[in-house]
Design a protein with these regions (language model features):
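ATPase nucleotide-binding head domains, primarily ABC-like/P-loop NTPase cores
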Residues: 35-38, 233, 303-304, 311-314, ...
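Amphipathic heptad-repeat alpha-helical coiled-coil/stalk segments that mediate oligomerization
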Residues: 208-220, 270-274, 286, 377-456, ...
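Charged catalytic and DNA/RNA-contacting regions of genome-maintenance
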Residues: 1-334, 350, 354-363, 367-459, ...
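Intracellular alpha-helical coupling/juxtamembrane segments of multi-pass membrane proteins
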Residues: 325-328, 348, 352, 450, ...
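Conserved catalytic alpha/beta cores of large enzymes that bind or transform nucleotide phosphates
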Residues: 171, 176-183, 190, 512-545, ...
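Extended active-site and interfacial segments that coordinate phosphate-rich ligands
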Residues: 38-55, 146-174, 490-521, 601-611, ...
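Conserved phosphate-binding elements of NTP-dependent enzyme cores
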Residues: 1-2, 9-13, 20, 539, ...
Length: 864
């Protein structure tokens, strides 16, 4: 190391401590990268790769690769690296290079990871960005998650043989960007597949002991927080301790905005497994992974990013307490009934900045002048909101009114200190308001009026000395000087100090002139430094008020979410459901909340639902494909879920007993990554449901057994339904869609089972789906008619009819083979049927004469 230059030695020492990160090494106005980091950054960021001569750098085998980026535009580059899964260690100059003696001191100020980003370019406004931790040990599991961009921190515990399954569901619900795992959790196959393949989150494997974990938690949240953790389960304490230790290690600073811990217990919220979240399309669609088309898309009419995040969390954590559900629904109902206040609140909430994330940047010291001014703009909107809330005399809305601190003092402090439109960088100056600080005003006067000040001094000196030809000038050698011609040099005062003799005169300086010169030449640096000092004082003061500001931000988020639910209820014609512990699901004229919004021009057919603890506990639903069986079942599940987040529901009326869990088995697909076939995936999911469900669960089962032979599939479907419906075994409320019509006889053999079908009207060879759920089993599946709607050739349709008749008449005797002659005929008739099918599909009235002629020619060619 002795042969290295001091700067490269410093670089390598810092890099050695951050081997797993790309090191952004501050050199002047740039962040430079060297060696392998430079190669990686050049490739990932499309940067030009240059080299640094070897000189004394014998630690490198050849010229040192290097590349760099301007420090003031680093956020975008960091965001791109983080999105690609890298970590970035930011190494700053920790002293002023102008005053440094020798090598400038540098140190890591922060390590940016996927779970710890703070800048807006890397964050989705309406979605939390969690860094999580999971701890697994035999039959105990702990989970913790923190969004450092808002300060929200959660933790929970699971015990028993299914602890690992519950942990898996919790990780899926939070969908963290990064997760810290102990060795046992890291080796868990299901957890590895979820985090690596499905969530694509960054994994860190770390261990921590009990005393260190307790110290981290007590230091962050206080000793009292330790009492929340169960005495018989150490896993959540170790998970949270591991997470906090990692956050302190990467953030290198105070995390005092993370001051509130939400420790929740199993049973507070409805647990939804990965399959249910996916199949019900709560936050994104199955196919496109888009928000549009999801339940969140329908519900999210929030005006703030804080409200959007809270509403999303409500949707992902339905409540189980009737009291808590009613408490939230009461707020929604009051807002529904008070149109004027609701609309005024929506207007007042509009444009409020993301107070939570602004405060995180302020606490970390990364906030600029524009961030602080954005906070001020948000704070100034709080008083009108508080005034509007005073119309609610009681309940949670009144509590929000009391909680909402208008923070007038902080808004006033910011307004007095900062300009309304500060520059992008606080290093540019000109962001402290005129009149706030006398010295700033004086230095600005000097900076902007330097020429005027010199002209004023020149006039004063002329008057004082009586020298008419006296003038003040400037050159790079002497700076400012007073020049007097030879004819007046005898009148020069003793206070003038001669600096230069000219042919026609003399040049002098005075102490007063040198003082003014110093002010003018250093004013820019001095005012910039003073403004930055005043700004950091303000930022520190605001950081000290983080608890007050975050409390008001939380109140705004909750109010915004409630207003959103109320707005949706009014615009979509929802009703308030009665939620109780009766175990009954009774829905009149229920509608699918998403389907009716995706197809606003089509008339949505509402349907009734009744499922009691005894009568109608299980419903067998038969009918053709495309008729709406899956839509109806999802509709029931979504109405239940909406009710349990405190929302109104798309129905004329509803009475809903609280459901502890919703399970879904819908659709079929291979899981190639796990080496499982479609049928194996289906059976695994059914097995998980039967083991985890209780009598208070709602089961949505679609086409169980279709992935194997007919008799095997029918046997499995019947056995599963018997198990679900039998109160001596499971007795859960079950919606069971099937094409096995033989199962409909279970209505007579198993109490609590009822048959329903989707009404269909046949018109000749055509069918019309009425979308209405009616009692009784379907008498046929209309599969051939659906095939015709899908556009299968008429020759295939005709052959299918023949086979069906033979199967129905001979009770399973194999259909007679098609004769060779028939084959030959069918080949020609197939062309004819394709032509007929094409003609049926064409909208002839919309064709131009030329298009019609081309179509005719094409069809004739096909027949020939």
């Amino acid at each position: 190391m002795a042969e290295l230059t001091p700067m490269m030695k410093q670089y390598l020492e810092i890099k050695e401590q951050n081997k797993d990160s790309i090191l952004f090494f501050r050199l002047g106005d740039f962040y430079e990268m060297f060696g392998s980091d430079a190669r990686t950054a050049s490739r990932e960021l499309d940067l030009t790769l240059t080299t640094r001569d070897k000189d004394k750098n014998k630690s490198f085998d050849e010229k040192v690769p290097m590349c760099g980026i301007p420090y003031h535009s680093s956020e975008g580059y960091i965001a791109r690296l983080i999105a690609k899964g890298y970590k970035v260690a930011i190494c700053e100059q920790t002293e002023d290079p102008a005053t440094a003696k020798g090598l400038v001191k540098r140190d890591i100020i922060r390590v940016v990871t996927p779970g710890t980003v703070l800048d807006d370019t890397s964050l989705e406004a309406g979605r939390s960005n969690f860094c999580a931790a999971a701890w697994l040990a035999e039959d105990k599991a702990g989970f913790a998650a923190c969004d450092i961009s808002t300060g929200q921190t959660h933790a929970t515990a699971f015990s028993g043989p299914d602890a690992g399954v519950h942990l898996l569901n919790e990780v899926a619900r939070f969908s963290p960007a990064e997760i810290i795992l102990n060795d046992t959790a890291a080796q868990d196959a299901a957890l590895r597949m979820l985090t690596e393949n499905k969530l694509s989150c960054h994994r860190e494997i770390r261990e921590i002991d009990g005393p260190a974990a307790r110290a981290s938690i007590a230091g962050q949240f206080g000793e009292k927080a330790l009492s929340d953790f169960p005495a018989d389960n150490f896993a959540p304490l170790l998970a949270l301790g591991n997470l906090l230790h990692y956050l302190h290690e990467t953030q290198k600073g105070d995390l005092h905005h993370i001051d509130t811990l939400d420790f929740y217990r199993q049973g507070q919220f409805m647990e939804l497994d990965i399959s249910a979240r996916r199949n019900l399309e709560l936050t994104e669609t199955l196919r496109g992974k888009e928000k549009k088309g999801s339940l969140l898309w329908v519900l999210d009419k929030t005006k703030t990013a804080m409200g959007a995040r809270m509403l999303r969390s409500w949707l992902e954590r339905p409540l189980l307490s009737v009291r808590d559900i009613d408490r939230r629904a009461d707020c929604v109902e009051r807002l529904v009934n008070d149109t004027v206040t609701r609309e005024e609140l929506a207007l007042a909430l509009s444009g409020i900045g993301d107070m939570e994330r602004l405060m995180s940047r302020i606490v970390y010291g990364s906030a600029g002048g524009r961030d602080v001014v954005a906070l001020r703009a948000a704070l100034e909107k709080l008083p009108p909101i508080k005034r509007l809330l005073t119309v609610f005399p009681k309940g949670r809305l009144q509590e929000l009114c009391r909680t909402l601190d208008t923070l007038d003092d902080l808004a006033g402090r910011i307004a007095a200190t900062l300009q309304d439109e500060p520059p992008f960088s606080v290093r540019e100056g000109e962001f402290i308001r005129d009149g706030f600080h006398p010295e700033v005003d004086r230095l600005r006067g000097i900076l902007h009026g330097g020429k005027g000040l010199m002209a004023s001094m020149e006039a004063q000196e002329k008057e004082k000395t009586g020298i008419r030809t006296l003038k003040i000038g400037y050159n790079k050698v002497f700076g400012y000087y007073i020049e007097v011609s030879n004819s007046f040099k005898d009148q020069v005062p003793d206070t003038y100090i001669r600096k230069q003799t000219l042919v026609n005169g003399e040049r002098y300086i005075t102490q007063e002139l040198k003082n003014l010169e110093s002010d003018i030449l250093t004013a820019a640096d001095r005012v910039s430094a003073l403004e930055y000092e005043l700004f950091t004082d303000l930022r520190t003061e605001l950081a000290g008020q983080v608890s007050r500001i975050q409390a008001s931000a939380s109140a705004v988020a909750e109010l915004d979410s409630l207003c959103s639910l109320a707005s949706v209820a009014v615009s979509n014609g929802y009703c308030r459901p009665t939620v109780d512990d009766s175990g009954v699901l009774e829905i009149h004229d229920g509608r699918h909340p998403v389907v009716e919004k995706m197809r606003p021009d089509a008339l949505f057919v509402p349907n009734d639902t009744y499922m009691g603890e005894k009568e109608g506990r299980a419903a067998i639903i038969t009918g053709p494909n495309m008729a709406g069986k899956s839509t109806y079942m999802r509709q029931v599940a979504l109405i239940v879920l909406l009710a349990q987040i405190g929302s109104f529901v798309p129905a004329k009326s509803a009475r809903l007993g609280v459901v502890d869990r919703i399970f879904t088995r819908i659709g079929a697909s291979d899981d190639l990554s796990a080496g499982q076939s479609t049928f194996m995936v289906e059976m695994t999911e059914v097995s998980d449901i039967l083991h985890a469900a209780t009598k208070d669960s709602l089961l949505i089962l679609d086409e169980i057994g279709r992935g194997t032979s007919t008799f095997d599939g029918m046997s499995i479907a019947r056995a599963v339904l018997e198990y679900c419906a039998d109160p001596k075994k499971l007795g859960a409320k079950t919606l069971f869609a099937t094409h096995y019509h033989e199962l409909t006889d279970m209505e007579h053999s198993l109490p609590g089972v009822q048959n329903y079908n989707i009404a269909v009207r046949a018109r000749g060879e055509e069918i019309i789906f009425l979308r209405k759920i009616v009692p009784g089993g379907a008498d046929r599946s209309y599969g051939i008619e659906v095939a015709r709607l899908a556009g299968l050739p008429e020759g295939v349709i005709a052959r299918a009819k023949t086979i069906l008749r033979e199967l129905e008449s001979e009770a399973g005797k194999p259909p007679a083979p098609i004769q060779e002659e028939a084959d030959q005929v069918s080949l020609s008739s197939l062309a004819e049927t394709e032509v007929l099918s094409r003609l049926r599909r064409e909208q002839v009235d919309t064709l131009s004469p030329l298009e019609a002629l081309n179509l005719l020619y094409e069809l004739k060619q096909k027949l020939q």
